UniProtKB/Swiss-Prot annotation:
UniProt keywords, alphabetically: Chlorophyll biosynthesis, Chloroplast, NADP, Oxidoreductase, Photosynthesis, Plastid, Transit peptide
This protein's encoding gene: PORA
UniProt function note: Phototransformation of protochlorophyllide (Pchlide) to chlorophyllide (Chlide). PORA may also function as a photoprotectant during the transitory stage from dark to light. Functions in skotomorphogenesis, photomorphogenesis and throughout the plant life under specific light conditions.
Residues annotated as signal peptide: none
Subcellular location: Plastid, Chloroplast
Pathway in which the depicted protein is active: Porphyrin-containing compound metabolism; chlorophyll biosynthesis
Predominant cellular place of this UniProt entry's protein: plastid
UniProt protein name: Protochlorophyllide reductase A, chloroplastic
Pfam family, one: adh_short
Subunit details: Forms large complexes including TOC33, pPORA and OEP161 during pPORA import into plastids at the plastid envelope membrane. Interacts with CPP1 during plastid import.
Further comment found in the protein's record: The presence of TOC33 is not required for the import of PORA into plastids.
Source organism superkingdom: Eukaryota
GO cellular component, one term: chloroplast
Transit peptide: 1-69
Length: 405
């Protein structure tokens, strides 16, 4: 009976999706009865209730759709901005590292390549040596490009910049790392333009390179653009190592202003007699002064981070290859066990890579160092290495020497 009743009722009427009765169902419904009881009035009430319930449910569905649409419309700008920001960081960063065929430069290139987030342009004097070094270090082939750069020739610096631009790669970070150190030299040697070699390579070559590439850094869309110049504790006379004779001293820059050619001027920045170890230390003071002057002239308008660093004493580096054999033998254990300042090339490379890429090291105008637990900190520079007026004068004289003024 229950099934029969249900069949009679379902055949008697049907309801459209919008909650209204079909016409045929309505007329049939008026004349129907079940078990002698009229269904007309009761069914009318039931269908009115059903119709209202359907309308309420439809209204709720419509309201939810409107709310979802409003939420999407409201969040669209931020989603779009976020996606654009992500697109900026999806590509690998491009970093130029000078002197990347050995020592600190190679260790840095390797550390950056291993992250998978950087493409390293190895700017080196010896192309084949750099290629072999990258392969020996296990750097993936697509993680680096070797390009020729001889910092002892300003023409080579200009040619490197031209070749780099022809490659149509953006420049996101420039690392000025290459250096020459002649601690036992009694007579100066000179660059192609006639500058004393240590200052010519370590300072003037990098100065021209940085000045020419500053526009490329400005044009980068990378989130954190940086220019890093490697300094040295030996040029910082407020440290124990910086007070080991001969100490760095730029004097009144008379030798630099005279061209450092050893002919009509001294080959030393301060105008004194040539001392190979001092020439290196003086060049490092110039590096640190130049970094600070870049910061003052460009950081506020460009957002580029300018920094210098001393990654620790890499006592086994090839930088000391021209020292006497006894020094090369005793210096590493002395640094490792007495001063505790020794770091391996690998560790130093990781520290420099940290200054290249670490989001926590974006402060500009800073000279970074590391403590014995390998934690980075802002170190203080000596009075001369932080002299604002001297930095300005070094900048202006250097511009003239490299042909920019």
């Amino acid at each position: 009976m229950a099934l029969q009743a249900a069949s009679l009722v379902s055949s008697a009427f049907s309801v459209r999706k919008d909650g209204k009765l079909n016409a045929s169902a309505s007329s049939s419904f008026k004349e129907s009865s079940l078990f002698g009881v009229s269904l007309s009035e009761q069914s009318k009430a039931d269908f009115v209730s059903s119709s209202l319930r359907c309308k309420r449910e439809q209204s709720l569905r419509n309201n939810k759709a409107i709310i979802r649409a409003q939420a999407i419309a409201t969040s669209t700008p931020s989603v779009t901005k976020s996606s654009l920001d992500r697109k900026k960081t999806l590509r690998k960063g491009n970093v130029v590292v000078t002197g990347a065929s050995s020592g600190l430069g190679l260790a840095t290139a390797k550390a950056l390549a291993e992250t998978g987030k950087w493409h390293v342009i190895m700017a080196c004097r010896d192309f084949l040596k750099a290629e072999r070094a990258a392969q020996s270090a296990g750097m993936p082939k697509d993680s680096y490009t070797v390009m020729h750069l001889d910092l002892a020739s300003l023409d080579s610096v200009r040619q490197f910049v031209d070749n780099f631009r022809r490659a149509e790669m953006p420049l996101d970070v420039l690392v000025c790392n290459a250096a020459v150190y002649q601690p036992t030299a009694n007579q100066p040697t000179f660059t192609a333009e006639g500058f004393e070699l240590s200052v010519g390579i370590n300072h003037l070559g990098h100065f021209l390179l940085s000045r020419l590439l500053i526009d490329d850094l400005k044009n980068s869309d990378y989130p954190s653009k940086r220019l890093i110049i490697v300094g040295s504790i030996t040029g910082n006379t407020n440290t124990l190592a910086g007070n080991v004779p001969p100490k760095a001293n730029l004097g009144d820059l008379r030798g630099l202003a005279g061209g450092l050619n050893g002919l009509n001027s001294s080959a030393m920045i301060d105008g004194g007699d040539f001392v190979g170890a001092k020439a290196y230390k003086d060049s490092k003071v110039c590096n640190m002064l130049t970094m600070q002057e870049f910061h003052r002239r460009f950081h506020e308008d460009t957002g580029i981070t300018f920094a210098s660093l001393y990654p620790g004493c890499i006592a086994t580096t090839g930088l000391f290859r021209e020292h006497i054999p006894l020094f090369r033998t005793l210096f590493p254990p002395f640094q490792k066990y007495i001063t505790k300042g020794y770091v391996s090339e690998s560790e130093a490379g990781k520290r420099l890579a940290q200054v290249v890429a670490d989001p926590s090291l974006t402060k500009s105008g800073v000279y970074w160092s590391w403590n014995k637990t390998s934690a980075s900190f802002e170190n203080q520079l000596s009075q001369e290495a932080s002299d604002v007026e001297k930095a300005r004068r070094v900048w202006e004289v250097s511009e003239k020497l490299v042909g920019l003024a």
